């Protein structure tokens, strides 16, 4: 079943600067897909178009059969409960506790007043603790997030995404700020999310070898265009070199 459909997607700024050009692909339920490409290829912009954090200039994006670009504010807010986001720099509130940050993932289901006053149900709180336990950080539930390591903070970010009950999680360079051991822990958890919960994961990565190890499928972006889309075991060295060019020598492996 197709969960995400991107058709002739284009994004440009100031009229002329084209960041994405004629991007087309489909992703099914339960797939683990990685997007690779050099800095400036358009990877982050692509994820932000899917979630409509930035407006689409051309083409269309469908999530679970619904056109993201045509949605009004209320409908878009509802759709976003099905789209989890994980960010490179965690996007947590440092002064709040771990459990509070996780529960922020339920804001899409709340009225503005409920969100402001932190009115969460006992069931939601129980779910938050279950997720923290699943990711091995339940003991830190009442610590401030700025007291955690980077890897621990990213696990909080994963819990916050999961408590939304999403159908797809968009991960924007989730291990770029982490050491090798923490990176492996995060990637292992993301893979388990797909395998055990059936949640689709679309993961931007700069580390090609990590993408090949974890992803079922890889999409290669270069200058805003798709130049590779296929199984990870079909991404050969010549194609990697064509995607990254002179940057290929500087690629990070974990």
UniProtKB/Swiss-Prot annotation:
ATP binds at residues 37-44. Its EC number is 7.3.2.2. It catalyses: phosphonate(out) + ATP + H2O = phosphonate(in) + ADP + phosphate + H(+). Keywords: ATP-binding, Cell membrane, Membrane, Nucleotide-binding, Phosphonate transport, Translocase, Transport. Residues 4-248 form the ABC transporter domain. GO terms for molecular function: ABC-type phosphonate transporter activity; ATP binding; ATP hydrolysis activity. It comes from the Bacteria. It is an enzyme of class 7 (translocase). It is a peripheral membrane protein. InterPro entries: AAA+_ATPase, ABC_transporter-like_ATP-bd, ABC_transporter-like_CS, ABC_transpr_PhnC, MetN_ABC_transporter-like, P-loop_NTPase. It is found in: Cell membrane. PROSITE patterns: ABC_TRANSPORTER_1 (PS00211), ABC_TRANSPORTER_2 (PS50893), PHNC (PS51249). It holds the Pfam family ABC_tran. SUPFAM superfamilies: P-loop containing nucleoside triphosphate hydrolases. GO terms for cellular component: plasma membrane. CDD domains: ABC_PhnC_transporter. Belongs to the ABC transporter superfamily. Phosphonates importer (TC 3.A.1.9.1) family. PANTHER family: AMINO ACID IMPORT ATP-BINDING PROTEIN (PTHR43166), PHOSPHONATES IMPORT ATP-BINDING PROTEIN PHNC (PTHR43166:SF6). The complex is composed of two ATP-binding proteins (PhnC), two transmembrane proteins (PhnE) and a solute-binding protein (PhnD). Part of the ABC transporter complex PhnCDE involved in phosphonates import. Responsible for energy coupling to the transport system. NCBIfam families: ABC_phnC. This is Phosphonates import ATP-binding protein PhnC 2. It comes from Oceanobacillus iheyensis (strain DSM 14371 / CIP 107618 / JCM 11309 / KCTC 3954 / HTE831).
